[in-house]
């Protein structure tokens, strides 16, 4: 049993982001197709089930890595990321926002169904938005880690300390993934950082972009809820 757990952890730990996204997308697509076959009377539910499974499986696989990594492991893993990983971060954030927008559109159909089906649609919609919120800010947490541990600037010149840094974490110079998630979710909830200092221009710009995206996300959720109330 322990060997099986070790192999499973090794597999999850060594999953590249693209492969992880491909696996989770495949699971979501299969779930959507099966749900449509079984629940053809509500294609909205089929879409939501596929979207929820995609987000949930992605967060679970990524969560295993995040919770298990200490400072050195975080630095080692981040240093192996490809420079083009920024494109995947942008794609992940875009998909979270797009998915939330689609959920908002689906909520307009609540009033067209029976009470039981409407409750099911509302429950799945809330779950999908919640998972998209977690996915959005987890992606920013990963991006902060990549920027912090990046060894060279945009011109290919190595940093004096061997890494960019840009954040000053109390008590450690080798933060873990959880430390970067702390930054991301603190910004998401309060739009401020109390004990972590921002010490580089690039990090300040990234924090600004993160805050604006977060505000846009909340605005879309609010608009979707109001639209659902008006149309139901």
Protein language model regions, located:
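Pore domain of cation channels
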Residues: 179-186, 194-232
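Loop-to-helix transition at the N-terminal end of transmembrane alpha-helices
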Residues: 42-60
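Alpha-helical transmembrane segments and their membrane-interface junctions
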Residues: 95-116, 185-201
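Juxtamembrane helix-capping/reentrant segments at transmembrane boundaries
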Residues: 74-94
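Hydrophobic alpha-helical transmembrane segments of multi-pass integral membrane proteins
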Residues: 26-29, 89-105, 182-186, 221
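Membrane-proximal soluble regions of multi-pass membrane proteins
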Residues: 148-150, 154-197
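The first (N-terminal) embedded transmembrane alpha-helix
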Residues: 14-38
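Transmembrane alpha-helix/helix-exit interface in multi-pass inner-membrane proteins
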Residues: 129-156
């Amino acid at each position: 049993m322990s060997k099986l757990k070790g192999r499973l952890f090794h597999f999850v730990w060594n999953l590249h982001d693209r492969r992880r996204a491909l696996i989770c997308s495949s699971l979501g697509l299969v779930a959507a197709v099966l749900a449509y076959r079984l629940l053809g009377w509500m294609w909205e539910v089929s879409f939501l089930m596929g979207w929820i499974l995609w987000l949930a499986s992605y967060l679970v696989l990524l969560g295993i890595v995040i919770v298990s990594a200490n400072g050195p492991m975080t630095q080692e893993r981040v240093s192996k990321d490809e420079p083009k990983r920024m494109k995947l971060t942008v794609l992940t954030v875009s998909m979270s926002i797009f998915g939330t927008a689609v959920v908002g559109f689906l909520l307009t159909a609540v009033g067209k169904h029976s009470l039981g089906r409407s409750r099911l649609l509302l429950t799945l919609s809330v779950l999908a938005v919640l998972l998209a919120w977690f996915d959005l800010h987890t992606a920013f947490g990963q991006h902060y880690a990549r920027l912090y541990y990046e060894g060279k600037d945009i011109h290919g010149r190595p940093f004096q300390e061997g890494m960019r840094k840009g954040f000053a974490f109390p008590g450690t110079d080798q933060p873990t993934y959880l430390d970067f998630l702390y930054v991301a979710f603190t910004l998401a909830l309060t739009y401020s950082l109390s004990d972590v200092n921002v010490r580089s221009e690039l990090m300040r710009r990234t924090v600004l972009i993160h805050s604006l995206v977060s505000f846009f996300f909340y605005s879309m959720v609010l608009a979707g809820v109001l639209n659902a109330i008006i149309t139901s």
